[in-house]
Amino acid sequence: IMGYKGYQMEDKDYLEFYEKLQYLNVSIVPEQKQGYFQKKIQVFNNSVGYASKEAGGNLIVKEQWLENPEWTIYIQIKDEESRELAERIMARKCTYMPYLGKNDHMADISGMCIVSGEERFPKNETADSLVPEGAVQFDWDEMTYRYEEYLPVGLKESTNLYRTHRFIFTDAEMDQCMQPVYKVEGRNLLFF
């Protein structure tokens, strides 16, 4: 969206997009029952000789992607970088076409708006967003679902590979919040 450089930058510790956006706070609400999306696996076979250095020159690639994912993503506007990102999203002004993981999986960005939220520390209410592990103590007695997954939260400086953190999506009530929860459009959101 912002036009920052990515993986072709080999002379810096971090990639430009990460240097600029690593402090951006987001909250992600899966718009799928229980937060789980069906996955699809496709195997590609490229048998042209230059595709692989292996004997026989046959390259086999196995890809996995989510089927019809849908999230509502909230961006906390707190500095010039996040303000510019919000303005570009609202104006549908992207330097490059946004995509999900791979450029043949285009992102469909819709329903953009600027909203306000109220900072709270609720008890006996559910979180509507993904919750970083350790941010909330839950009462697991009455829950009907609990989805957990390790997701990328940053890059390692030495390798530019993902740093991951465990996230929880559940209908269990929050017992204690270690970080603020924002009430936005009737939803309880945690930012990370």
Model-predicted regions and their roles:
Residues 9-19:
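Short, glycine/acidic-rich hinge or "gate" loops at secondary-structure transitions
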Residues 23-192:
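Internal, well-folded beta-alpha domain core
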Residues 1-9:
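N-terminal ordered "arm"
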